[in-house]
Amino acid sequence: MSGILDLLGSNLGKSIISGVSGSAGTDESKTSAALTMALPVLMTAMKRNAATPKGAEGLMGALNGKHDGSILDNLGGLFGGGVDDNVKQEGDKILSHVLGDKQSGVEKIISEKSGLDAASIANILKISAPILMGVVGRQSKQDNMNSSGDLSGMLGNFIGGNDMKEEQNFLEKILDAGGDGSVVDDVASM
């Protein structure tokens, strides 16, 4: 399995970047930069959530249900006429669950780092979150994952698949630089 940043460089990743950029009405290179920052942060936050039995059970249920990877089967249709509001609403729910009250802080920091305004970042994240869940769901199916106990390892492989220890440490710092569970102050130190 390759890492999440490797995915962005693949043909699928390029389709995702192009589609998200078109749907959000943002510059493709800035959208790519935003996703390069955001997706590993979201994966790391998912991994942390999956570290608790309740979090792992909830994520496993989502991956076995709505987020089974089928969204990836028709990205052209997803992006073709603009992303449906239902997809954005689902993305907002995912972000709220994964990031909680840290969501706006993460959006603000990614905005500052990418050069896109916070509203554009929020839109990019809402569109990409269900796609990211689809990527995770597809991988869990390929791995025949039936137990929520295996989730943390799989998510770690997505994050660590890039073979960048420094990058992993950076992600951990983003999510908890102050040791207080706060993402906002941690992302600010990027």
Predicted ranges, named:
Residues 1-190:
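A structural "flexibility-hinge" signal
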